Amino acid sequence: MKHLITFCMCIISFIAFGQIKNIDMKKQKPKDMKKQKPKNLTECIQMLDKNLKKQDKEYIKTLTEDEFFMESHFTLGMGIRNEWLRSGNPELVKFFLDQGVKHPDDMSAMILTSYYRHLTMVND
């Protein structure tokens, strides 16, 4: 019974607090994003800046860093992992491996965090 209640509370919380404005990489410019192969973090930021819509950038600026990360991990972050990291982009993967970042989730997290800080001019 305890597990059922916990499960129900998790589902309710997800529905109540999981109202995500999708910034979906695949909805931006699918053909362009698939063709682009950034080689390092700077190129990732430049390509995101080029491909995200102005309204999405403005929306991102209204979020805290944690909110942006939580909202984008399964949307924009998944697009980054699928299109840039897992689709055979050895230069970008090598860049992150050289930095000691081994898992695609961590790689996309670094890209997302860096992009957020680029947009909001946070220098941490």
Positions of predicted regions on the chain:
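Bacterial Sec-dependent N-terminal signal peptides
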Residues: 1-22
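Compositionally biased amphipathic helical and low-complexity segments enriched in hydrophobic
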Residues: 5, 26-29, 42, 108, ...
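A near-ubiquitous, low-amplitude feature marking generic local secondary-structure context
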Residues: 8, 24-27, 31, 35, ...
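A general, composition-driven signal for non-globular sequence regions
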Residues: 13-15, 31, 75
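Sec-dependent signal peptide cleavage junction
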Residues: 17-46, 50, 124
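Compact alpha-helical subdomains of small soluble proteins
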Residues: 55-124
